A protein has these predicted regions:
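Membrane-proximal intracellular helices of multi-pass ion channels
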Residues: 1-373
Length: 373
């Protein structure tokens, strides 16, 4: 095991986190004021930057023969994620989303519990799980009986950070790091194998770094298109459109509202999100090839065909079950499409109370939850 290479991986990852932390810090200055920005993001940036610089200081540059090997790649990926989650938890904790060291008259046990909650929220974000502990009983920003929407009561800059963690986690923090590491030392493919799931890693470009840039470019483009669609077609506020675009493309499901997409009560918003949830469930390599005109790749791709089949079958069966209990056909199709894609891609948005749907519909959704995972 070459620990200097591990220090390089971890060090550059910690330094790379300064970019999203700094970005959200600046947005917090604009939307919530200097005091909160300094309180929430400055400590996280100092910790991340200090640790990153210290680890890079321990790195001894290797020659071309000392490329990144599978052993260092797998260990590095295993260490990057918890370290990233730890740094990602600090803005919630220091910023008062959960009880932290800057909350007045807080007990030590509550501060420790607040750190655990912050860790949970960060882990859920970076892994795109979408579960949340933001509630009236957990957040000091939510007053029971007074605050109607607990999530929306949080500072804007910290909600943006929450959504951005899902966006970064969706393509993979390590995938982003490959853009840097594959240039500094060799062996980027080893890091990719350690990070990415699936039977193979297709190269869209001659070099792995170019492939990573191509995929991130596609990811960014789709995110921007969804932002614009939600804002100018769906009628969302700019802030909500940005946040929901950040959490749709990674199939994350964080929302700025307790009621999720149901809050907007808009068929237009639901249709836009349906389109992008479907795209988020498609292999990005395949989307790139289709964008280049290679539609035969989609026809031949077994994964894509299976995706279409199980989504289509689920939509037909659940729609029939809803129509049989008196739901109008158009509404049944819309609700079914939304929740089949939301659950089938593990996004987790909700636009209706599907717990009240017929038993057969709930069973199908449960099976989709397993398949989508």
């Amino acid at each position: 095991m070459r620990y200097d290479v591990l220090n390089l991986i971890l060090g550059w990852t910690l330094l790379a986190l300064l970019v999203p932390l700094g970005f959200c810090g600046l947005i917090t200055v604009w939307l919530d004021g200097w005091e909160l920005a300094l309180q929430a993001f400055l400590p996280a940036m100092l910790i991340s930057g200090g640790l990153g610089a210290a680890m890079l200081g321990l790195f001894t540059r290797t020659d071309s023969a000392q490329r990144l090997r599978d052993l260092e790649a797998f260990v590095g990926v295993g260490l990057v994620w918890p370290l990233t989650v730890l740094i990602g938890a600090f803005p919630y904790w220091f910023g008062g989303v959960f009880v932290g060291p800057f909350v007045d008259d807080a007990l030590l046990i509550d501060i420790l519990r607040g750190f655990v909650n912050s860790w949970f929220e960060s882990m859920s974000g970076f892994t795109t799980s979408g579960a949340t502990v933001l509630s009236h009983s957990m957040s000091p920003n939510c007053i029971p009986g007074t605050t109607v929407d607990c999530i929306n009561a949080q500072p804007r800059g910290l909600l943006l950070w929450r959504s951005l963690t899902q966006w970064l986690g969706g393509m993979g923090v390590v995938m982003l790091g490959m853009l840097v590491l594959s240039r500094i030392i060799g062996g980027g493919m080893a890091l990719a194998r350690a990070e990415l799931t699936g039977p193979s890693l297709s190269r869209l470009r001659p070099k792995l770094r170019q492939t990573a840039m191509a995929l991130w470019g596609l990811y960014l483009m789709l995110t921007l298109i969804e932002m614009l669609a939600l804002k100018f077609i769906g009628g969302m506020s700019a802030f909500d459109a940005i946040n929901h675009a950040f959490t749709t493309m990674p199939s994350g499901g964080f929302s700025t509202r307790d009621a999720s997409i149901a809050y907007y009560d808009s068929s237009t918003v639901e249709i836009i999100i349906i389109v992008f949830m479907f795209l988020a469930g498609v292999n990005f390599t395949l989307m790139w090839l289709m964008g280049a005109g290679d539609f035969k790749a989609a026809i031949k791709d077994e994964e894509f065909r299976t995706y279409l089949i199980y989504i289509s079958v689920a939509v037909v069966l659940i729609t029939i079950s809803l129509v049989l209990v008196g739901v109008a056909l158009g509404q049944a199709v819309l609700d079914t499409l939304f929740h089949v894609l939301s659950i089938g891609t593990s996004t987790g948005y909700a636009s209706a109370d599907y717990a009240s749907w017929p038993g057969v519909a709930r069973i199908i959704l449960f099976l989709l939850m397993i398949i989508g995972a």
